[in-house]
Regions:
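Short, glycine-/polar-rich solvent-exposed loops and beta-turns at beta-strand/coil boundaries
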Residues: 32-34
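A short, hydrophobic beta-strand-centered structural micro-motif
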Residues: 37-45
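Short acidic/glycine-rich loop or secondary-structure boundary segments that cap or lie
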Residues: 36-37, 51
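Charged, amphipathic alpha-helical segments and their flanking helix caps
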Residues: 1-30, 44-134
Length: 134
């Protein structure tokens, strides 16, 4: 049996580091009651391991949630465009944790008006990750 490590922490750190360095909307791991909008927050992460016996490959789906208090879609669309540009123009760096990113792409984006004021959105990022130590 092969040792298996989950790249959850490495993935979240790589996304946080890249987005913090390359765009201006604040990124939060947890959104408290006093958080100021607009902001980006980590949402759901799903991960599956490939059935290959000789290579540890993971398929991760990470959701980034975007919140805006502006009553037009222009702010949220601009933030989504910035995030999409960053995540498709630069490769996530997970090498220090012993993982390599084989592929990354945005698979879905959804925007919705909020009940009270503003808009929220979800951007889904799919990442194929190889465990270089496994």
């Amino acid at each position: 049996m092969r040792k298996k490590r989950l790249p959850l922490q490495a993935l979240q750190k790589a996304v946080r580091d890249l987005l913090t360095a390359c765009q201006t909307t604040p990124l939060h791991e947890h959104v408290g009651e006093t958080a100021k909008l607009p902001l980006i927050a980590f949402g759901e992460i799903r991960m599956s391991l490939s059935g290959a016996k000789d290579t540890a490959l993971y398929r991760a789906e990470m959701e980034l949630e975007v919140y805006s208090s502006t009553n037009s879609r222009s702010e949220i669309n601009g933030i989504l465009d910035d995030v999409a540009t960053v995540l498709t123009a630069a490769r996530l760096d997970m090498h220090t944790a012993g993982f390599a990113v084989c592929d990354q792409e945005i698979t879905e984006v959804q925007t919705n008006p909020r009940e009270v004021r503003g808009y929220d959105a979800t951007l889904r990022l799919e990442v194929i990750i190889q465990d270089m130590e496994g």
